[in-house]
């Protein structure tokens, strides 16, 4: 009888351990996105990425609580804090939230708008299971597919263009130029070249190739649904819309 009870207890303990191991493996397994997934709009990210709407929820940096990470319904009801990180450059997709920490201090709040932030992080949609993808000074971040593209700081290169996979296992330098990844569309990142002629450039995330989309003196380029929008520095800072289907015709660009 005692032997049977002992065997039963051992069996139950074994089953419990198996369940715990299974749950641990399942909770640590990364949920991946499709190749064209994005985490936020260029307009939001170019303005600090302080909020992001996803699946009828708004994830935001609460200005009344030191820019800590909050979520609320899309009708602005039921706001609640997700964690105590002061955040910016918020991206949300699939099972995760991605953001840059601000290490908030009253005297450094302006760093959000100067792009001087500290570390790229991933957490679950409930704000838990925090994972550092990069833990030093960084700039704007954006999700494309299963990689976070971001401006990376180092002692040798003040800001460079990097990507890190959402599991945080592989970090790759793409360029020594600090391109902004804010505008992601169909697996391509578009940006105004911060050096040289300020052309609109495109970076193919599948081939890792950068090319000139349009020869112009641009700033804050944004590409959406067949059109590129940018500020033309040579036309008194006019807002210009470019039909990307007519790039090589005289009717391509219109001032707005």
Ranges and model annotations:
Residues 1-15:
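N-terminal Sec-pathway targeting helices
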Residues 36-42, 78-83, 129-134, 170-175, ...:
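A short beta-strand motif characteristic of beta-propeller blades
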Residues 38-67, 88:
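Beta-strand-rich domains and repeat architectures in extracellular enzymes and scaffolds
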Residues 46-51, 86-94, 136-144, 178-185, ...:
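Repeated scaffold domains used in trafficking and secretory/extracellular systems
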Residues 59-60, 99-100, 149-151, 190-191, ...:
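Residue position within the beta-strands of beta-propeller blades
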Residues 63-66, 107-117, 154-159, 194-197, ...:
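Short, solvent-exposed loop/turn segments at conserved positions within beta-propeller repeat blades
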Residues 73-75, 124-128, 165-169, 204-208, ...:
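Short loop/turn segments that connect beta-strands within beta-propeller blades
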Residues 248-255:
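Conserved small/polar residues in nucleotide/adenosyl-binding loops
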